[in-house]
Amino acid sequence: SEMKEHKLETYMKKENIIFIGMPAVGKSTVGVVVAKRLGKKFIDTDLLIQEQEKKLLREIIAEVGEDGFLKIENQVNRDVDVENAVISPGGSIVYCEEAMQHYKEIGTIVYLQASYQTIKQRIRNPKKRGVVLREGQTLKDLYDERCVLFEKYADIIVNEDQCEIGDTIENVLEELSRL
C-alpha cells in the first residue's frame, strides 16, 4: 500500500538494519537484497575483520583461538560507524556484548529465526561452514545457547521455516514497514 511504502521510505532514510541469526539463515543473501530494495549500503562485518587482520577468519581462529577471535569481532563491530546501511555480522556476534549494545543504539536488529531442523538440514558440515564448536559441544548445544541471545537482542523476529529466501525477504520488509 502507498501508506506502507511511504513509511518504509521515511523509516529507512538514516536507519541501519542489523541481521542476526545462526549460520545458514541467509544473513548475507537477505541482507544484500534488502539493502538493494531500500537503497542502503551493505556491510558484511566478517569481511571487515578479514580486511583489518589481513587474514581469513579460520586463520585468525587457528592463531588466537575462539576467545581471541571474539575480542577482534567485538572491536570491529563496535567500531562500525555508518548510517543508512544493512549490516550482517557473523553468528558469534551475540557473544560480543559491547558490539550488540552498539547495534541496539544505531539500528534495528532483525533476527532471522529458523528451527533446529532447518539449520541442521542447511549446515551439512559445520566445520566447512566455519562454525566453531567447543570441545564436546554439538550443533544443537550451540543452537540452544545462541537462540536465547538472539531473542534477547532482537527488535524484530522473522521466522523462515518452510520459507523460500524470497518469502523471507518480503517478510522482513513487511515487518520493517510496521515499525
Task: Tell what function each PLM region has.
Residues 25:
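ATP-binding Walker
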